[in-house]
Regions:
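Extracytoplasmic/periplasmic substrate-recognition and gating elements
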Residues: 162, 239-243, 279-343
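Extracytoplasmic "Venus flytrap"/periplasmic binding protein-like
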Residues: 62, 66-128, 160-162, 169, ...
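Hinge/lid segment of periplasmic solute-binding proteins
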Residues: 102-149, 173-175, 201-203, 208, ...
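Conserved N-terminal structural module of periplasmic/extracytoplasmic solute-binding proteins
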Residues: 2-105, 295-298, 403, 411-416
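Conserved C-terminal helix/tail region of periplasmic/extracytoplasmic solute-binding proteins
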Residues: 160, 239, 365-416
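Glycine-centered hinge/linker elements that transmit conformational signals in sensory
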Residues: 178-182, 219-248
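Extracytoplasmic/periplasmic solute-binding protein
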Residues: 141-144, 150, 172-221, 264
């Protein structure tokens, strides 16, 4: 979720051809009374058995039965590569009709997208906190499709072995507990500041000290005193040996897998960590739990909430608008939202689906955190800022936090 947004670079020929094949330019355009829609979606699966391709092709087949004149071609792209590949496709004017993944604001700025109200009958059913995030200059273009929130996962067996009797509430608790776990030969706290999702891990720690990427007025505050102090703390946490070595080179998914193997005591995670734990076959459901994330002086009252968006491209004028609307109305039914969430351990984006899952023992605690969730900045400058965060913020825990954060702040101010 909130996926890799690197600067547009030359991708492999295979990647470009893959999206070119999905483009609705040229041979894939509609013919006669029939319509062909091309959907490019991020793959959230952990392998062939639960690839997102299977999910979307199932919806496409059901939809085609109900609407024989409309065919939906499905292409899924590795979650980590989605943004780069879509950007390359758009740059080459090979537009998909519908995308489901991350990142919409630059395309809205360029006038390439339909508004939500133009391609969905009931956009009011989308969760308000994320609908607002999907807006650009007062109009909604990004349609939240799947959401997630963050909690602190910890290994109860390692806690017991280390003599820890309760979940950490503060940063001091985190450090003390992590060092006790380290003394037992395991990694105390997993700190993924590598390129996969450093922007998310960083924000969780910023929030713990009253910081953020922006303040309430919308001013960039990346190098604020609070954030510098946060990374000074993390630098000390790393140097103490409480984390894995070199967090700036460690990606979230890799550390999640180590947690699932019982090698890490604590790590910040989302519901997407649960299937990794289940597939690891090392930790039973009673061996781990999740709780609110510890802040400097107490647990976070609001955590990071993220969502991935559907975007509908104005591909070939308005000739496909009605077909896109039919498909999105179909795909956003509660049964498909719930199916997606249970398959990939993510959260719904519609109010009706969230209500149906509120009492679910797995999803309930995460859904409870969503209404107060904090999101990433939604303006177009965030694309460049996020890339720099992913590439450099890990060096703040081994070098000079003030300098590293100041460089990112300069990028944000220059873009704004």
């Amino acid at each position: 979720m909130n996926r890799r947004l690197a600067a547009i670079t030359a991708l492999s020929a295979a990647a470009a051809l893959a999206l070119s094949a999905c483009s609705s330019s040229g041979s894939s355009s509609s013919s006669g009374s029939s319509k062909t829609l091309n959907l490019v979606a991020a793959d959230y699966g952990t392998g062939p058995a639960n690839s997102s391709t299977k999910y979307w092709k199932g919806i496409a087949a059901d939809f085609h039965k109900a609407n024989p004149s409309i065919t939906v071609n499905v292409k899924t792209v590795n979650w980590n590569d989605f943004d780069n590949q879509i950007q390359t496709s758009v740059q080459n004017h090979q537009y998909p009709d519908i995308t489901e993944g991350d990142y919409f604001s630059n395309y809205a700025q360029e006038g390439l997208l339909y508004k939500a109200s133009e391609v969905m009958s009931n956009p009011g059913n989308l969760m308000p906190v994320f609908s607002k995030l999907g807006s650009y200059k007062g109009s909604q273009y990004g349609l939240p499709f799947t959401t997630s929130s963050r909690t602190l996962f910890y290994n109860k067996k390692l806690f017991q072995a280390a003599g820890i009797t309760s979940a950490p509430q503060t940063w001091d608790d985190v450090k003390a507990d992590a060092l006790k776990i380290k003394a037992k030969g395991k990694i105390g706290f997993g700190l993924p500041l590598g390129s996969e999702e450093a922007q998310g891990e960083s924000l969780l720690w910023m929030l713990g000290n009253g910081g953020n990427y922006k303040d309430a007025s919308g001013t960039w505050t990346i190098d604020s005193a609070q954030n510098v102090a946060t990374f000074d703390y993390l630098k000390g946490l790393v140097s103490s040996g409480a984390t894995e070595p070199n967090p700036g080179t460690k990606n979230r998914t890799d550390l999640w897998k180590q947690f699932a193997q019982g090698e890490i005591g604590m790590i910040n995670g989302s519901p997407a960590l649960i299937p990794i734990i289940e597939q690891g076959k090392v930790l039973s459901s009673s061996d781990w739990t999740s709780v609110p994330i510890a802040g400097k002086s107490g647990p976070l009252q609001s955590t990071l909430g993220v969502c991935d968006f559907v975007a509908a491209f104005k591909n070939g004028g308005t000739s496909k608008q009605a077909a896109i609307k039919k498909f999105l109305d179909f795909a956003y039914q509660d049964k498909y939202q719930v199916q997606f969430d249970k398959e990939y351990k993510l959260l719904p984006a519609t109010t009706s689906a969230a209500t149906s899952l509120a009492s679910d023992p797995v999803f309930g605690p995460f859904l409870k955190a969503l209404p107060k969730a904090v999101q990433y900045p939604s303006d177009t400058v965030w694309a460049n800022v996020k890339t720099q965060v992913q590439q450099t913020i890990g060096t703040a825990v081994t070098g000079d936090p003030k300098q590293v954060l100041g460089n990112i702040q300069a990028t944000a101010k220059k873009g704004g």
